[in-house]
Amino acid sequence: MTYQFSHDDLIWKALGDARRRLIIEVLATGPKQTGDLVQLFPDIGRTGVLKHIDVLTEGGIIHVRREGRTRWNHLDPEPIRSVCNSWVAKHIDGIKSSATKLKLIAEKEQ
């Protein structure tokens, strides 16, 4: 039996690497050519950067537009926002409960 990755799994995978998070931060300032992104990581070269771009594209975080031989990479922050909001919503009740308890303890001590 093999596990099927959900779309959310692909987004978390994309966010799980520091280099991919840096690519996201750079693209948050605007679209960049692939060559610009390659310059950020001289240690892994073009092939390594393209593999990271592929993971981000698979998660829907980056959209690539080709103009001739030039690849423009565009950030779509919505998938990140969606999985983060969903994850926080699942855990917020416990956080609210802890905060309420902390407030009650603090008020008793006064």
Spans of model-derived segments:
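A cross-family signal for key residues in well-ordered alpha-helices
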Residues: 13, 25, 57, 63, ...
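Amphipathic alpha-helical dimerization/coiled-coil segments
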Residues: 1-7, 25, 81-110
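Charge-dense, helix-prone N-terminal extensions
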Residues: 33, 62, 106-110
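Conserved catalytic core of two-component sensor histidine kinases
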Residues: 50
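Beta-hairpin "wing" of winged helix-turn-helix
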Residues: 58-68, 74
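Short, hydrophobic-biased segments on the C-terminal half of alpha helices
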Residues: 53-54
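N-terminal helix-turn-helix DNA-binding core of bacterial DNA-binding proteins
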Residues: 6-47, 70-82, 86
